[in-house]
């Protein structure tokens, strides 16, 4: 599994909005300038995230974006999942999209399931607020 540019930019956008929304709605123009990301690309990402109910959008003068809930209620995993879709490290774990004929006898399947669980648990345990506050824990590999 590789996090795409879209996923990385989505997380950066959400962090930026969380950091700056105390002064009101945050424009994508401002996010684009601060983050060095194309405004057009951010518009596509913001649309997906808004449709998922994670952002509130207001058009017009003094419009922009704001988190729909407190930053503490968004996990990094939930944000990435909106734009990335499946976070499975291998195709055979994307059940809805792919059925491997060897799934029932595959000796390596438990390895991939374990890796997926580590990734999911780690990213689910980090909130947007944690990222904003710089409280990103190292992975607990025990």
Task: Give, region by region, the residue ranges found by the protein language model.
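Short amphipathic alpha-helical interface segments
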Residues: 10-22
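A short alpha-helical element within helix-turn-helix/winged-helix DNA-binding domains
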Residues: 26-36
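Key DNA-contact positions within bacterial/archaeal DNA-binding proteins
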Residues: 40
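Basic amphipathic alpha-helical segments that dock to polyanions
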Residues: 45-50
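Residue cluster at the C-terminal edge of the helix-turn-helix DNA-binding motif
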Residues: 51-54, 82
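Beta-hairpin "wing" of winged helix-turn-helix
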Residues: 54-62, 66-67
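C-terminal regulatory/oligomerization modules of transcriptional regulators
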Residues: 76, 94-142
């Amino acid at each position: 599994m590789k996090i795409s540019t879209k996923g990385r930019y989505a997380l950066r956008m959400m962090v930026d909005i969380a950091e700056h929304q105390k002064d009101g709605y945050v424009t994508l123009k401002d996010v684009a300038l601060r983050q060095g990301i194309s405004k057009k690309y951010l518009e596509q990402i913001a649309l997906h995230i808004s449709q998922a109910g994670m952002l509130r959008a207001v058009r017009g003068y003094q419009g922009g974006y704001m988190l729909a809930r407190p930053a503490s209620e968004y996990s990094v995993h939930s944000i990435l999942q909106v734009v990335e879709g499946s976070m499975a490290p291998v195709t055979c774990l994307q059940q809805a999209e792919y059925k491997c004929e060897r799934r029932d006898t595959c000796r390596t399947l438990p390895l991939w399931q374990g890796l997926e669980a580590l990734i999911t648990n780690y990213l689910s345990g980090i909130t947007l607020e944690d990222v904003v506050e710089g409280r990103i824990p190292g992975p607990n590999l025990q």
